[in-house]
Amino acid sequence: GELAAELFTVPGKVALYLEGEAPALAAETGANVGVEIICGARRLAYVPGAAGLPPALRERLAGADVILFDATLFTDDEMIATGTGAKTGRRMGHMPLDGADGTLATLAGLGGRRILTHINNTNPILIEGSSERRQVEAAGFEVAADGMEIVL
């Protein structure tokens, strides 16, 4: 079938070099986007960075056959806890996977294939067999891997 792509706004923040003293961390300004790839009746939504999941974005994702979604950090304070950074995930414009308003909870119930991508090297879901990896897999998510191919 014919292939098409459409950009859509995703809550996020501006690039670090554009930040002022008090940057908007979950703004929908168009500075942060996702892309929907459409092939015939099949749809893939790619959201490499997301600071939140408002109803309109969840509705868009609900119709996708495949969702590739930001999984930068498992917990919001992961960078601080591991000593690898001073900012929380939300401060960097990324929802954590865990927690009541994290990615696992907010994407729960959506159909289709849900694949986690844009994974920071501190994120324990990268470790096969870790409790965090088992948690995301039990929730119906896949962890993206280098060289992964997706057929719509």
Feature annotation, model-predicted:
Residues G1-R60, D146-L152:
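Core dinuclear metal-dependent hydrolase active-site scaffold
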Residues G30-N32, G40-R43, A51-M148:
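Cap/insert and terminal regions of metallo-dependent hydrolase folds
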